[in-house]
From Swiss-Prot:
ATP binds at residues 10-18, 38, 119. Its main location: cytoplasm. This is Argininosuccinate synthase. It is an enzyme of class 6 (ligase). Its EC number is 6.3.4.5. One of its GO terms (cellular component) is cytoplasm. Pfam families: Arginosuc_syn_C, Arginosuc_synth. Homotetramer. CDD domains: ASS (cd01999).
Amino acid sequence: MGRAEKVVLAYSGGVDTSVCIPYLMHEWGVKEVITLAADLGQGEELGPIKQKALNSGAVVSLVEDGREEFITDYAFPAIKANALYENRYPLATALARPLIAKMLVRAAEKYGADAVAHGCTAKGNDQVRFDLGILAQNPEIKVLAPAREWGMSREEAITYGEQYGLTFPVKKSSPFSIDKNLLGRSIEAGPLEDPMCEPPEEVFEMVKAISDTPDEPEYLEIGFEKGVPVMVNGEALGPVALISKLNEIVGNHGIGRIDMIENRVVGIKSREIYESPAMCVLVDAHRDLESLTLTADVTQYKRGMEQTYSELIYRGLWFSPLKQAVDAFIEQTQERVTGVVRLKLHKGTARIVGRRSEKSIYTPDLATYGADDKFNHESAEGFIYIWGLPTRVWAQANK
């Protein structure tokens, strides 16, 4: 008896998920493998994926469009939270996993599958994100993870797949692992495992090299409504179109590359290369607009919550009670975050040069040092006396 009768496999067309199809059938005795490829903006690589899965042994190959849901229900909440894992990574890959988990469970219930599967390895973060995301949707369903158990290196997995007629777009001598969606690309493995190895230019796709960027700067205006980006340069755009346009504009100026050593969920450090042009400028612009529209105490408290939020996403806890509670807090803070932020893009930098909002609590006649100054200067001395009282008492007690 096999591990399961019918399995829905999260399928990307890459090495691990492709090898999972024959492995599930020949090694684990699964009778039917249904593949599900979530279209989250991968682009051309999704073209042949349906037939590739069928050629690899799948009985049904599904490609489902999740782009709108991905941006609206996952990316936009992350932007509201200014979510950057370890203050750098805008979580492009991590945000996709809970949605894919949700889609897997939907497909399993539709097709009567008794298990779902993924191709994540035992060292990665995605195994945690998929397993927890799946179990949050259906705690009774089996979760199979062949790559966590088969013990094959990437080169051995390629050889195994080739025995069953599979072909791969990577070379055994330099097998980069690449994940792509609308929010960005992640690149790892191969020579990049040496943290001193500079990434070769050919691994980048979304963000131009500085030497290839325009010599003249470009100004970019992003409009927000209640924390959600809705306009680019005065043009109202839907979620998918907005992210796509920003990726193109920002990436053209060499903005959005990230090279970092990050701390994985399983306790190891890994070297990761990311491209995420739209998300990088959206988080920066959104944070700046908050500085114009939120009070100091709310802003300060929210910054701590943002770190928690980022860690929850990274660690696979999207559907957790704490994540839901933090969501409620962040949503409340966004009622006033409406306005426009202006950025200057040039040679790898996105510098914020202006912002405006009808909800602004910046008051020019209180901030000015000119003749229009309405700040009550006489109140400063009394304020300092009260504010400094604990310091003065402490100093006297410690003479």
